[in-house]
C-alpha cells in the first residue's frame, strides 16, 4: 500500500511502494508543479501531503518520490516540447513500482485508490511510536508546536486530543481540499465531455476488431434480415449468434486438427510405405535383382536354350517350370550393371573371352549365375550351353527387364544382419554391399584393382576396419569414392532398414504426444497423492469438535452425506465453543456489566513475551501484541480505515462541537464478547470471518439446514457472523412465502424492528435504470426456531445480518423486484469491504451495513479478514469452517480455498448417480493436483473462502486481497456487450472470481482443503443437468481463455500452470471429438489385427488411475461402483453435454436450474438494459460524513451533547456499554459509541 515503511529490507509487495525523501527535502514545501502530482494547499499542515488530480489522462496517480523528476511515472508520455524531430528519451530499466501502467495492468485500480490515501511522512524514517509522539510537536516537520494543556488527563496515555481550534482549522482545510477536488473534477469533467462531444461530432464508428471481422466472414451466408425471421431482431442477439458461430468454427478447426494429428498426419507425411522384405525372408515367388524383389509368379520367359515353350504356347515360368527352381534366389549377375562407375577400374584380361568394343566396354564382369540370398553360395564360373548364356546382353532382353518388369518390394537388412559375422557386408549411402561377391571375379577374364582384394578378404586389416559398418563417411576421398560407387552398381544386395523423413517426423510427433500426455496424466496422479498424503495435513486444524481418526471421520462424512437433512455425527462441544456469554441462555448484560480489567492489567493487553514465537498474524493478535503502536492502527500512520472513518484529521480529536451519539447508535446488549487474543482453542490464532450466504429462491427447509449448519460449526461465535444477501423478493417454485420472508423469520433480537427498516440505495451491477437498486438491512441474531432439532443447550448465539434487495419503487410491481444476480450480491459485500479498508465514499446501504455489523458484533468491520461463501442450499460439516480458517491463518499466502462438495441425493435417479464420481475426481484429482502449485483454477461458489486482506511486511501493514480495487472493479463490470463477457459474468461468476484472483495475484495461492466438507443436492432430472452443465462448460471455456494469458503463474514452459491451463482448455474444446476417436480406436482394435496398443494404453491409464486414487487414499470402496457408473455415462459427459453447451453459447439464462413462481424463460440474463441510470438517486459519502449527519440529527432530537453527558456523568457518558475484547475498552474513545 502507499504507506511509510520501516527502514531496511522487506519482502516484495504487490502494491506500489512509497519512498521517503530526505529530511532537508521533506522540510521544504513541495513545488507547485501539476506534473509531479503535488501542490501546496491553503490551510494544510506542512506535514500532510495531499495529492491533487493531474491534468493528464491519469487524474489520480502515485506522486513521485523525487520532486525533481520531470513528471509522474504513471502519467502517459507527454508530447515533445519541440516537435521538430528531436528524438524523445526511450524507456529504460527502472524500478517496477515506477513503471507506467495501463488499464490492463493487474494493479492499475489498486494504485489509483492507494494514491488517494493520505500519507503522514515520518521525520525519523521509522513508524511513529505513540510515546514519541506525546513529546513531539503536532507538526512532524518541526514547524509548529504543541500545548500540553490540550491533552486530556483522563484519556489513555496513547491518545492525543486536538484543541477546538485545531479541529476547526482541520475542517476548514478539509473543506478547502474538497473545494479544490471538486473544482478539478469539474474541470476534468468538462474536458471529458468536450472530447466526448468531439467524438460524437465526428460521427465515426468504432473500428471493428479482427474477431468481429472473422465472425462476420464465417456467417456471411446469413444476413441480418434472415436472423430476424428466426427470432433474433436485436443487434445484440445477432452479434451473439455470430460470435457463437465464430467460436464453433474455431472449435471445429481444433477438433479437425486433433483428428488430423491422430489419424491423418502419418498418412500424409509418411504415406503408405512400400512393401519391404527382410533378407532371408524373401519368398519363393520372388527373385532378387540389385537389392529389389520382383514378383515373377505370373511371368513368362521367351523360349531359349534350356527354357522350352509351354504347351499353352507361352514361355516357361522361371520360378516353377524349369528343372532348377530360382525362386528366392538373387539374379543380379543375370542383368549386370556394366560400363558405368566401374569403367576403367575393371578391365578385360589378355586372352579373355568377354566381348568388348573399342571403347573398352565389357559385356559382363561376373559369371552369369544366380546365388542364394543368405550369402552361402560359392563362386560358380561354369558356362552352360554357350558363352554369355543367361547374361542378357541384347537390347531386347535389357528393355524387357528394366522397362517391362516392376519391382514389388525392397529388400532390407537390419543392422544385426549387417553385423552378422558370417557375412561380409558394408553400408554405403544406405545401400548394403556384399564384399563376398568380389570373389566371383574370374581372374582369367577380367582385371581389377588390388584394393578390391584388400577389401574382400576377411583376414586383411582393411576388411576388418569396414566390415559390418557404414563406410559412407570413410570413403570420401576421390579414389575410395569411385570404388564405393562401383561396388554400389555391381554388388548391391539390398538397403538398410531406414525410414523416410516423413515417417520419422510422424513417429516423433506420436511419441512426443505420448510422452506429454503420459507425463501430464501421471504427474496429476502422483502429485494429487502427494497432496492427499502430506500437504493437505498441514492445512488442517490440530483439533476440532469431530473425531481425529481420519478413516472414522471419512465414514461419518459418507453417512452424513446420505441425506441432505441428516444431522452431523457430533455437535460441537466444549472444544471450539466461545467464551462465557456466547450462549443464548446466559445473561445478555453480563459481558458489559462485569469488569474485565483491573488497575494491574497492562494497558496493551497480553504481554508480547507471553505469546508463542512465530505465530501467524491476525487482526486480533496484531492489535493485542502492538505495545508501542496504537491498538487501532491497522494500516499505519493515519491510513487505517477505522481511524479515518472516525476522524477527519489523522491527529485530530474524535470529538467536535457537532458530535452526537456514537456509531451505530448502540451496541446490542446480547453481543458475543470477544475472548483474549491469545486464546487458541484449535492451535492457531483466531481470525474474524464473515459467512456469506447468497439466497435466491430457496425454500424454508433448505435455508434452515444451511443456516443451522453454519451456526453450529465449532468455530467460536465471537469470530464469525452470518451475512445473508437475498437476490430480490423471490418466491421459490411451490413456496408459500418469499425467500426473504422465510429468512427474516429465522432472526431474533433485532437491533431495529423489521417493520421499521427502511430501504437504502446502492449502485447495482446492471445497466440502465437497473443500476439503481435499493436494499434493506436487518440485523440481529440467528433464531434456531421452536421446533429445532438442535438441543437447546447446544444452541449458540450467532450474530446475523440479512440484506434484502427489494428494488426501487418503480419495479415493485414486477415479478422479481430487486433481482440483479448473484454477482451483484457478492459485489455488495466486496465493495463494502473495499470502502471500509480504503475509507472511500460509500452508499447509504454500505453505511447501514457498517453500523449493523457494529451493533451485533461490537467490533469494527475492518477486523474481518476472511469471507466464507456458501449457497443457501449447501450444508456445512461442523468442523469445516475451522479447517478452512486454519489453512488461511497458517499460510498468509493463501488468498482463496475451497472444500469438498459431496452429493446428498446420490440415489435419487440415474442422473444424480452419474455425478457422484465426477464430483470425487474433480476434487481429489484435479483440485488436489492444482493445490500443489497453489493454483486451483475454480473455487466453487457454493463452498469456498477468500481472504479479505493479508498481512504484509512489517507489523500493522495489510494489503487488500478480495477487497482489492482491481478485483472489485473487474468483477463489478456492468458493460457486458460481448459473448465472452456474458459467459464470464452472467453464467460463471463464481469461477470468474477465482480467475480474477489468480490474474491479480498470480504469486499467491488458491488451494483445496479436503478436510472441509459440505453437502448439496444435484440435479436429478436430465434437462436440469443439461442446463446446469451448459453454464458450467461455457464458463469453464471462457475462464480458461482468460487464465491462459496470465504469464506469471507457477512454473515455466511445459512445467507451468499456464501450460496445464492450455491443455485443459484444448481438452475441454475437443471433448466430443475425443470420445468419438476413442470409440473408433476401440472398434478398430477389435476388428483389425494387430490392435493399436498406444491409444489403448493411454485410454486405460486415463480411466484407471482414478480407481487407484480411490484405493490408495482410503476413501469408501463404494466409489469403485460409482466409477463404473461414471464410465458407462462417458458419452453423456464427453459428447452430449459439451455439444449442447457449444450450440448454446449465446444462451445466457440459467435455464431450469432454479425455478421461481411465475418465471418466464429469457436468454438475456441480468445483462438486459432497461431505461437510463439516474445517479442523482444515490447518495455517496465517506463514513465520517454520514456519521456526522446522523449525529447532527441525533443531537437535534436528543438535545445537546453536554446535557446528555452531564446527565450520565463522567467524561464519556457513552462508555458504559463498551464492548470487551481486542482491547477496545482501552481505546474505545476512538469510536463515537453511545451504547
UniProtKB/Swiss-Prot annotation:
GO terms for biological process: ascospore wall assembly; chitin biosynthetic process; protein localization to bud neck. It is found in: Cell membrane. Residues 94-107, 169-187, 549-558, 1220-1235 have a biased composition (Basic and acidic residues). Residues 1-203, 545-592, 645-670, 1201-1235 are annotated as: Disordered. It is a multi-pass membrane protein. Its EC number is 2.4.1.16. Residues 648-665 have a biased composition (Low complexity). Residues 46-59, 116-125 have a biased composition (Polar residues). InterPro entries: Chitin_synth (IPR004835), CHS4-like_dom (IPR054295), Nucleotide-diphossugar_trans (IPR029044). Glycans are attached at residues 639, 1034. Keywords: Cell membrane, Cell wall biogenesis/degradation, Glycoprotein, Glycosyltransferase, Membrane, Transferase, Transmembrane, Transmembrane helix. Residues 1-212, 266-514, 1087-1092, 1138-1235 are cytoplasmic. GO terms for cellular component: cell periphery; cell septum; cellular bud neck; chitosome; incipient cellular bud site; plasma membrane; prospore membrane. Residues 19-28, 188-199 have a biased composition (Basic residues). The chain crosses the membrane at residues 213-233, 245-265, 515-535, 1066-1086, 1093-1113, 1117-1137. This is Chitin synthase 4. It comes from Neurospora crassa (strain ATCC 24698 / 74-OR23-1A / CBS 708.71 / DSM 1257 / FGSC 987). The gene is chs-4.
Amino acid at each position: 500500500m502507499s504507506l511509510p515503511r520501516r527502514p531496511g529490507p522487506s519482502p516484495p509487495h504487490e502494491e506500489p511502494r512509497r519512498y521517503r525523501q530526505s529530511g532537508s527535502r521533506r522540510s521544504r514545501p513541495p513545488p507547485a508543479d501539476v506534473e509531479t502530482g503535488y501542490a501546496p494547499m491553503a490551510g494544510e499542515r506542512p506535514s500532510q501531503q495531499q495529492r491533487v488530480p493531474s491534468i493528464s489522462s491519469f487524474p489520480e496517480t502515485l506522486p513521485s518520490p523525487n520532486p525533481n523528476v520531470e513528471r509522474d511515472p504513471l502519467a502517459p508520455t507527454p508530447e515533445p516540447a519541440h516537435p521538430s524531430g528531436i528524438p524523445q528519451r526511450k524507456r529504460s530499466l527502472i524500478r517496477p513500482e515506477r513503471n507506467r501502467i495501463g488499464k490492463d495492468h493487474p494493479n492499475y485500480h489498486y494504485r489509483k485508490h492507494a494514491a488517494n490515501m493520505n500519507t503522514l511522512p515520518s521525520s525519523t524514517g521509522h513508524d511513529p511510536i505513540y510515546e514519541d509522539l506525546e513529546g513531539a510537536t503536532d507538526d512532524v516537520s518541526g514547524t509548529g508546536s504543541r500545548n500540553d494543556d490540550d491533552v486530556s488527563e483522563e484519556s489513555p496515555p496513547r491518545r492525543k486530543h486536538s484543541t477546538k481550534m485545531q479541529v476547526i482549522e482541520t475542517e476548514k482545510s478539509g473543506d478547502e481540499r474538497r473545494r479544490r477536488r471538486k473544482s478539478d473534477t469539474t474541470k476534468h469533467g468538462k474536458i471529458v465531455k468536450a472530447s466526448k462531444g468531439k467524438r460524437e461530432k465526428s460521427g465515426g464508428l468504432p473500428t471493428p476488431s479482427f474477431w468481429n471481422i472473422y465472425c462476420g466472414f464465417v456467417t456471411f451466408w446469413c444476413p441480418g434480415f434472415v436472423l430476424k425471421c428466426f427470432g433474433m431482431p436485436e443487434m445484440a442477439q445477432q452479434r451473439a449468434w455470430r460470435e457463437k458461430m465464430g467460436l464453433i468454427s474455431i472449435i471445429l478447426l481444433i477438433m479437425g486438427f486433433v483428428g488430423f494429428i491422430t489419424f491423418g498426419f502419418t498418412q500424409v507425411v509418411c504415406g503408405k510405405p512400400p512393401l519391404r522384405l527382410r533378407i532371408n525372408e524373401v519368398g519363393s515367388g520372388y527373385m532378387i535383382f540389385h537389392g529389389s524383389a520382383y514378383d515373377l509368379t505370373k511371368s513368362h520367359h521367351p523360349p531359349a536354350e534350356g527354357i522350352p515353350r509351354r504347351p499353352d504356347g507361352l514361355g516357361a515360368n522361371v520360378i516353377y517350370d524349369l528343372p532348377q527352381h530360382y525362386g528366392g534366389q538373387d539374379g543380379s549377375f543375370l542383368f549386370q550393371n556394366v560400363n558405368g562407375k566401374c569403367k576403367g577400374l575393371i578391365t578385360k584380361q589378355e586372352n579373355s573371352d568377354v566381348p568388348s568394343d573399342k571403347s573398352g566396354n565389357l559385356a559382363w564382369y561376373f559369371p552369369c549365375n544366380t546365388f542364394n540370398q543368405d550369402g552361402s553360395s560359392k563362386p560358380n564360373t561354369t558356362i552352360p550351353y554357350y558363352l554369355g548364356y543367361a547374361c542378357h546382353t541384347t537390347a531386347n532382353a535389357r528393355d524387357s527387364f528394366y522397362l517391362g518388369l516392376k519391382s514389388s518390394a525392397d529388400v532390407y537388412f537390419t543392422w544385426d544382419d549387417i553385423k552378422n559375422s558370417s557375412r561380409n557386408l558394408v553400408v554405403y549411402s544406405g545401400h548394403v554391399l556384399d564384399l563376398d561377391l568380389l570373389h566371383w571375379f574370374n581372374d582369367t577374364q577380367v582385371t581389377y584393382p588390388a584394393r578390391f582384394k584388400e577389401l574382400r578378404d576377411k583376414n586383411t586389416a582393411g576388411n576388418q576396419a569396414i566390415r559390418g559398418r557404414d563406410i559412407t563417411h570413410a570413403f570420401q576421398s576421390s579414389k575410395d569414392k569411385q570404388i564405393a560407387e562401383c561396388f554400389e552398381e555391381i554388388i548391391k544386395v539390398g538397403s538398410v532398414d531406414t525410414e523416410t523423413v516423413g515417417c520419422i517426423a510422424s513417429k516423433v510427433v506420436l511419441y512426443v504426444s505420448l510422452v506429454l500426455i503420459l507425463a501430464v496424466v501421471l504427474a496429476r496422479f502422483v502429485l494429487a497423492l502427494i497432496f492427499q498424503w502430506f500437504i493437505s495435513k498441514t492445512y488442517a486444524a490440530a483439533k476440532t469438535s469431530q473425531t481425529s481418526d481420519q478413516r472414522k471421520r471419512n465414514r461419518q462424512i459418507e453417512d452424513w452425506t446420505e441425506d441432505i437433512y441428516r444431522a452431523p455425527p457430533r455437535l460441537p462441544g466444549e472444544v471450539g465453543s466461545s467464551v462465557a456469554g456466547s450462549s443464548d441462555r446466559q445473561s445478555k448484560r453480563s459481558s458489559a456489566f462485569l469488569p474485565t480489567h483491573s488497575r494491574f492489567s497492562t494497558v496493551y493487553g497480553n504481554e508480547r513475551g507471553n505469546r508463542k514465537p512465530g505465530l501467524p498474524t491476525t487482526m486480533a493478535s496484531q492489535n493485542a501484541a502492538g505495545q508501542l503502536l496504537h491498538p487501532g492502527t491497522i494500516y499505519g500512520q493515519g491510513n487505517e480505515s477505522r481511524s479515518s472513518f472516525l476522524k477527519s484529521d489523522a491527529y485530530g480529536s474524535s470529538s467536535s462541537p457537532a458530535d452526537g451519539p456514537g456509531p451505530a447508535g448502540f451496541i446490542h446488549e446480547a453481543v458475543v464478547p470477544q475472548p483474549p487474543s491469545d486464546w487458541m482453542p484449535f492451535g492457531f490464532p483466531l481470525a474474524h470471518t464473515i459467512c456469506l450466504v447468497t439466497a435466491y429462491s430457496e425454500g424454508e427447509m433448505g435455508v434452515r439446514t444451511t443456516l443451522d449448519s453454519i451456526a453450529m460449526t465449532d468455530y467460536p461465535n465471537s469470530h464469525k457472523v452470518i451475512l445473508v444477501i437475498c437476490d430480490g423478493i423471490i418466491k421459490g417454485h411451490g413456496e408459500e412465502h418469499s425467500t426473504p420472508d422465510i429468512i427474516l423469520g429465522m432472526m431474533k433480537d433485532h437491533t431495529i424492528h423489521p417493520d421499521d427498516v427502511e430501504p437504502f440505495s446502492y449502485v447495482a451491477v446492471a445497466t440502465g435504470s437497473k443500476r439503481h437498486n435499493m436494499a434493506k438491512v436487518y440485523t440481529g441474531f440467528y433464531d434456531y426456531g421452536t421446533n429445532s432439532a438442535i438441543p437447546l443447550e447446544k444452541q449458540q448465539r450467532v450474530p446475523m445480518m440479512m440484506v434484502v434487495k427489494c428494488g426501487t419503487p418503480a419495479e415493485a410491481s414486477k415479478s422479481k423486484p430487486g433481482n440483479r444476480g448473484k454477482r451483484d450480491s457478492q459485489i455488495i459485500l466486496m465493495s463494502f469491504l473495499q470502502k471500509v479498508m480504503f475509507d472511500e465514499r460509500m452508499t447509504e446501504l454500505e453505511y447501514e451495513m457498517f453500523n449493523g455489523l457494529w451493533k451485533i458484533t461490537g467490533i469494527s468491520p475492518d477486523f474481518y479478514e476472511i469471507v466464507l461463501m456458501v449457497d443457501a442450499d449447501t450444508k456445512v460439516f461442523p468442523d469445516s469452517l475451522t479447517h478452512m480458517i486454519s489453512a488461511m491463518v497458517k499460510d498468509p499466502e493463501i488468498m482463496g480455498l475451497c472444500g469438498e462438495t459431496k452429493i446428498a441425493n446420490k440415489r435419487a435417479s440415474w442422473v444424480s448417480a452419474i455425478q457422484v464420481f465426477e464430483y470425487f475426481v474433480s476434487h481429489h484429482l484435479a483440485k488436489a493436483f492444482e493445490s500443489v502449485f497453489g493454483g486451483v483454477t475454480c473455487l466453487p461458489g457454493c463452498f469456498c473462502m477468500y481472504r479479505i486482506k493479508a498481512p504484509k511486511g512489517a507489523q500493522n501493514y495489510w494489503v487488500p486481497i478480495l477487497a482489492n480495487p482491481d478485483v472489485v472493479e473487474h468483477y463489478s463490470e456492468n458493460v457486458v456487450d460481448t459473448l465472452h463477457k456474458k459467459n464470464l459474468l452472467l453464467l460463471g461468476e463464481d469461477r470468474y472470481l477465482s480467475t480474477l484472483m489468480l490474474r491479480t495475484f498470480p504469486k499467491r495461492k488458491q488451494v483445496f482443503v479436503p478436510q472441509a466438507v459440505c453437502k448439496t443436492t444435484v440435479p436429478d432430472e436430465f434437462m436440469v443437468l443439461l442446463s446446469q452443465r451448459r453454464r458450467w462448460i461455457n464458463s469453464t471455456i471462457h475462464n480458461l481463455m482468460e487464465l491462459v494469458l496470465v504469464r506469471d503463474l507457477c512454473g515455466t514452459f511445459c512445467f507451468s500452470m499456464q501450460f496445464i491451463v492450455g491443455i485443459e482448455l484444448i481438452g475441454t474444446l475437443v471433448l466430443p471429438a475425443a470420445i468419438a476417436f476413442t470409440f473408433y480406436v476401440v472398434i478398430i482394435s477389435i476388428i483389425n489385427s494387430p490392435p493399436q496398443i498406444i491409444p489403448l494404453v493411454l485410454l486405460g491409464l486415463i480411466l484407471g488411475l482414478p480407481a487407484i486414487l480411490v484405493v490408495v487414499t482410503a476413501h469408501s470402496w463404494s466409489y469403485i461402483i460409482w466409477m463404473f457408473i461414471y464410465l458407462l455415462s462417458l458419452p453423456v459427459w464427453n459428447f452430449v453435454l459439451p455439444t449442447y453447451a457449444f450450440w448454446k453459447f449465446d444462451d445466457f439464462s440459467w435455464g431450469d436450474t432454479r425455478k421461481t413462481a411465475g418465471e418466464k424463460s429469457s436468454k438475456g440474463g441480468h445483462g438486459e438494459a432497461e431505461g437510463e441510470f439516474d445517479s442523482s438517486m444515490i447518495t455517496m459519502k465517506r463514513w465520517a460524513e454520514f456519521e456526522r449527519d446522523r449525529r447532527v440529527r441525533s443531537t437535534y432530537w436528543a438535545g445537546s451533547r453536554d446535557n446528555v453527558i452531564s446527565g450520565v456523568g463522567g467524561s464519556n457518558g457513552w462508555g458504559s456499554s463498551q464492548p470487551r475484547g481486542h482491547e477496545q475498552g482501552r481505546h474505545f474513545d476512538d469510536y463515537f459509541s453511545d451504547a
